[in-house]
Amino acid sequence: MSKLKETLREKIEGWRPRTTRLIKEFGNVKLGEVTIEQAIGGMRSVKSLVTDISYLDPNEGIRFRGYTIPETLEKLPKAPGVDMPSVEGFVYLLLTGDIPSASDVQEIAAEFKARSGVPQYVFDVLRALPRDSHPMVMLSAAVVAMQRESEFAKAYEAGVNKMDYWESTYEDFMNLLAKLPTIAAYIYRMKYRADVVIPPNNDLDFGGNFAHMMGIPKPYDDVARMYFILHSDHESGNVSAHTGHLVASALSDMYYAQSAMLDGLAGPLHGLANQEVLRWIQGVMDKMDGKIPSEEEMKKFVWDTLKSGQVIPGYGHAVLRKTDPRYQTQREFCLKHLPNDDIFKFVDVLYKVVPDILVEQGKAKNPWPNVDAQSGVIQWYYGLKEYDFYTVLFGVGRAIGVGANIVWDRALGYPLERPKSLTTAMLEEVAGIKK
Ligand code: CMX
């Protein structure tokens, strides 16, 4: 058994009594109340999910296993000559809560290589889809097509003990994750690069191999590592993470759950916003004939968008109340690698004008930029101009966090999710509205 799986087993066995004790001895302790506004309003802030993989503080942003983004990037091992830690080490951190050693990272890299072969039928499925299908449709279809590979589904059918569900779930997670870079890059090259596919180079790490298969030179390998890590997890309540958790709670396996997760991510209020940001900026650039708008000109574009009833993509957040640290990390990368890029300058002018306008408009609870406001700029700069592909990059990253959560869901025996619904008439009655 790999050291990762062995460590995970120890962690799980140590953790289980904590969960059991909370339910048995403290099950009736209240975490909060639910208002009518929350019931109608998408369950905002209702404390009803548990995860130890990441925690989102409204002001500070995300912590992965207790570490802020700068701490995560600083503490995880890096290969010589690169700035960003490997995805392999990050997977170890999310699963176990520990910072891995360099040899732990190598062991996972070897595991990923051994598991990376994508079955031919997956490529056949992708080729059978209309070429103008959205790349998220392709990614989601490829993932669900692989459900027949599920070790969990086989183990369940064979009557595996509940306490061991996590083991085959872990196998599914690692198997799926190892294949995702190849599948994502295949979609890209098939759809946008005249179907010229670049085979994997198994000497490279997760991020490096992805950059290689995309056909984009250094430092895009670091962009890939940074991108997958930053997008991996944002606690459990966001649409993609929650969808993955919900579907898996029915004991649907990793493939079903991750495919559904991707479908949720594909919405314009969630993961599709990074493509929307670039589309919006391109629209402004067209109107400006390529010239960088002044702050006054940009203010007019922002107000025009708001007055036409649209949102400013890349701004606002359901939980965050400050600038997203994922935005900041990418901005620092831009300042280092592409300070003079026109689109980066556009994004900077936007940063100067949008928050004040959203405050003046008085609707958005958070006027600050989120992760999506900056991420497309970097992709565009490195030649990835087909912006409807950006959510696929988000999806590969998000699969890491959602998968780690699902492994722990099974380890701790989290049950089928089943909140209660009420009718409008019942809400009116609770509110004391007389008819
Ligand atoms: N531009 C214009 N209006 C905005 C806005 C924005 N960027 N962000 C919020 N608002 C509006 C909402 O549409 C809502 O209006 P109504 O009352 O007319 O419905 C009002 O402000 C209150 O919304 P909120 O409570 O501040 O935000 P929500 O929790 O409802 O929604 C989010 C959060 C992210 C969907 C929203 O801010 C938004 O639409 N942003 C633009 C899209 C985007 O960047 N999404 C990516 C989020 C990150 C991710 O998940 O990937």
Segment roles from a protein language model:
Residues 2-435:
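Hydrophobic alpha-helical bundle cores within soluble ligand-binding/oligomerization subdomains
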